[in-house]
UniProtKB/Swiss-Prot annotation:
Molecular function GO labels: RNA binding; zinc ion binding
UniProt KW keywords: Activator, Early protein, Host cytoplasm, Host nucleus, Host-virus interaction, Metal-binding, RNA-binding, Transcription, Transcription regulation, Zinc, Zinc-finger
Protein name: mRNA export factor ICP27 homolog
Zinc finger (CHC2-type) in chain: 359-446
UniProt feature, compositional bias: Polar residues: 71-85
GO biological process: regulation of DNA-templated transcription
Keyword Disulfide bond: no
Residues reported in the UniProt entry to bind Zn(2+): C359, H437, C441, C446
Compositional bias segments (type: Basic residues): 94-107, 178-187
Role: Multifunctional regulator of the expression of viral genes that mediates nuclear export of viral intronless mRNAs. This immediate early (EI) protein promotes the nuclear export of viral intronless mRNAs by interacting with mRNAs and host NXF1/TAP.
Subunit-structure text: Homodimer. Homodimerization is required for transactivation. Associates in a complex with RNA, and host export factors NXF1/TAP and ALYREF; these interactions allow nuclear export of viral transcripts. Interacts with three host shuttling SR proteins SRSF1, SRSF3 and SRSF7. Interacts with host SRPK1. Interacts with IE62; this interaction enhances IE62 transactivation.
Length: 470
C-alpha cells in the first residue's frame, strides 16, 4: 500500500521536522499503522560511530526526545520549535535560535524571559536550585568556569554531540565555591584600585610648598645650631636629682645620667650578685617615678641604636632581670625601664637578624621569624635564637597591651621556662647558630649575609650621596 493511503498514521510535516528528517525515504512501504510507525525510527541512529556518541545517537529516536542537562542558566536550551522542512539545519539541539546570546549586563531580565526553568531532577546534586550564585559584573571566564569534558567525546557534556565546536562552551560547569572565591578576589583587587583614588591622591598646596622651600629654611649654620641645642638638653636630662641612690648602694655608679660611657666589662656582675642586690634597683624604679620615666625614654632610644652584639647583651639583661623577678616572686611591672624597653629591643633584633634568620629557619623547617613573634608558641622553640625571640615577643606583647604587669604565665607555667635559662645564653647561642649555619649552608649569598651579620664592615651597597641644600 502506498504511503499516501495511510492517512491515519501519516506523520505531519511538523512531526517530521521534529524528528529531524526532511525526506520520506524511510517510508517505503507497509500496510498497517505499526509498519508505518516502525518506519519513523531512524535505524542508523543505533549504529555507533567514531564521531557520534551513544547519547547523541539515542537523541535521534522519535519516541524518546532528548532532555538537556542544565548545568547553568547560561546553558539552558530553548524549546524545540518547528523549522522549515526544506532547511538543512536540525530543528533542535543546535538550531540558530539556540545559539548562546551575549550576556546583557543591564538587561538580564529580558534575556531570561524566553528560557526554560531548569527541572529539579536534571540539576546536578552538587548544585542545588538555591545555591546558584547571583549574576554580577565578573569576567566571562570567572562566571562560566571550566569546560566540562573532552572535546573529542560526545558523551562528555550537553553540547558535545554538536555538528561544530562553537557550542562546546555550553558544557562548562561551575563550582559555587569557586564563584564566591573569585568574587571575593575580584572585590579585593577592586578595593585596592578605587576609582576615586587617582583623583584625590595628590599633594596639597601646603605640603608641596613645604617640600620645595626646605632649601631656604635649612642651612649649614642652622644644622650646627640643632646639634648644639641637643647637647645642652642632654646635659640635664632629669630634674630632682635623678634616682638619688645612696653612696653605699651597689647601683649608684650606674644610676647617674651622662656620667660615663657604657662599658660592659666594667659593669659585669654575677647571677648571685643580681639576686642579692636586684631588689634594691627594683624598688628604685618604683619609687623614683620621674627618673624612671626619663630612664624608659632614654633606654628605648638606646635599644634601637645598638649593634648586634650590644642588642644580644641587652636581651640577656632583660631575660636575666625577669628571671630575678620570678625568683624573688615580685610582680613584673610594665613601667619598669628594663621591661618597658623590650618592644624596642625586639624591633632592633628583628632588624639585625632578619636576613640571617630567613635562611636559618627555612633550612630547619621552623616557622618564619614573623610567625615566631606573632604566634609566640613555646612549641616552636628549637634553639637559642628562637627561644630569645619567643620570650621577648611575649614580654613585648604584655607591654604593648597596656597592662600593669606581665603575667607569670607569659614566661611559661608559673614562669618556669626561665628556670633553664643561663644568663649570657642569648649572646653565646646566637653567635654559635650564625657560625654553624654559615659552615653548613651551601648558598654563597647566605655565607655573605652570615659573615656580615657577625662583622658589619662596609663592603658594597651605597652608590652616591646627593645633597643640594648644604
Amino acid at each position: 500500500m502506498a504511503l499516501s493511503s495511510v492517512s491515519s498514521c501519516e506523520p505531519m510535516e511538523d512531526e517530521m521536522s521534529i524528528m529531524g528528517s526532511d525526506t520520506e525515504d524511510n517510508f517505503t512501504g507497509g500496510d498497517t499503522c505499526a509498519e508505518a510507525t516502525r518506519g519513523l525510527v531512524n535505524k542508523s541512529a543505533f549504529v555507533p560511530t567514531q564521531t557520534v556518541g551513544t547519547v547523541s545517537a539515542l537523541r535521534n529516536v522519535v519516541g524518546d526526545p532528548p532532555k538537556s542537562v542544565v548545568v547553568s542558566f547560561s546553558a539552558s536550551p530553548q524549546r524545540a520549535q518547528p523549522s522549515n522542512p526544506k532547511s538543512e539545519r536540525p530543528a533542535f539541539g543546535h538550531g540558530r535560535r539556540n545559539r548562546r546570546r551575549p550576556f546583557r549586563r543591564n538587561n538580564w531580565k529580558q534575556q531570561q524571559r524566553g528560557w526554560e526553568k531548569p527541572e529539579p531532577e536534571n540539576v546536578p546534586a552538587r548544585q542545588s536550585a538555591g545555591s546558584w550564585p547571583k549574576r554580577s559584573s565578573l569576567p566571562v571566564h570567572m562566571r562560566l568556569g571550566q569546560r566540562g569534558g573532552d572535546s573529542s567525546s560526545a558523551d562528555s557534556g550537553h553540547g558535545g554531540a554538536g555538528p561544530s565546536d562553537r557550542w562546546r562552551f555550553k558544557t562548562r560547569t561551575q563550582s559555587v565555591a569557586r564563584v564566591h572565591r573569585n568574587r571575593r578576589r575580584g572585590n579585593a583587587n577592586h578595593g585596592s584600585n578605587t576609582p576615586g583614588r587617582s583623583a584625590g591622591d595628590r599633594l596639597n598646596a601646603a605640603a608641596a610648598s613645604s617640600i620645595a622651600d626646605v632649601c631656604r629654611r635649612v642651612t649649614s649654620s642652622r644644622i650646627g645650631e640643632m646639634f648644639h641645642g641637643a647637647r645642652e638638653t642632654l646635659t640635664t636630662p632629669v630634674k630632682n636629682g635623678g634616682f638619688r641612690a645612696e653612696n653605699s648602694s651597689p647601683w649608684a655608679p650606674v644610676l647617674g645620667f651622662g656620667s660615663d660611657q657604657f662599658n660592659p666589662e666594667a659593669r659585669r656582675i654575677t647571677w648571685d650578685t643580681l639576686v642579692e642586690h636586684g631588689v634594691n634597683l627594683y624598688k628604685l624604679f618604683e619609687v623614683r617615678s620621674h627618673a624612671a620615666e626619663a630612664a624608659r625614654s632614654l633606654r628605648d632610644a638606646v635599644m634601637r641604636g645598638e649593634n648586634l652584639l650590644e642588642a644580644l647583651a641587652s636581651a640577656d639583661e632583660t631575660l636575666s632581670w625577669c628571671k630575678m623577678i620570678v625568683t624573688k616572686n615580685l610582680p613584673m611591672r610594665t613601667r619598669d625601664p628594663i621591661i618597658s624597653s623590650s618592644v624596642a629591643l625586639l624591633d632592633n633584633l628583628r632588624l639585625k637578624l632578619e636576613p640571617f634568620m630567613r635562611c636559618y629557619l627555612s633550612s630547619s623547617g621552623s616557622p618564619t621569624l614573623a610567625e615566631l613573634c606573632d604566634h609566640q608558641r613555646l612549641s616552636d622553640v628549637a634553639c637559642v635564637p628562637t627561644f630569645m625571640f619567643v620570650m621577648l615577643a611575649r614580654i613585648a606583647r604584655a607591654v604593648g597591651s597596656g597592662a600593669e604587669t606581665v603575667s607569670r604565665d607569659a614566661l611559661g607555667p608559673d614562669g618556669r621556662v626561665l628556670a633553664d635559662y643561663v644568663p649570657g645564653a642569648c649572646l653565646a647561642g646566637t653567635l654559635e647558630a650564625i657560625d654553624a649555619h654559615k659552615r653548613r649552608c651551601k648558598a654563597d649569598t647566605c655565607s655573605l649575609v652570615s659573615a656580615y651579620t657577625l662583622v658589619p664592615v662596609y663592603l658594597h651597597g651605597k652608590y652616591f650621596y646627593c645633597n643640594q641644600i648644604f
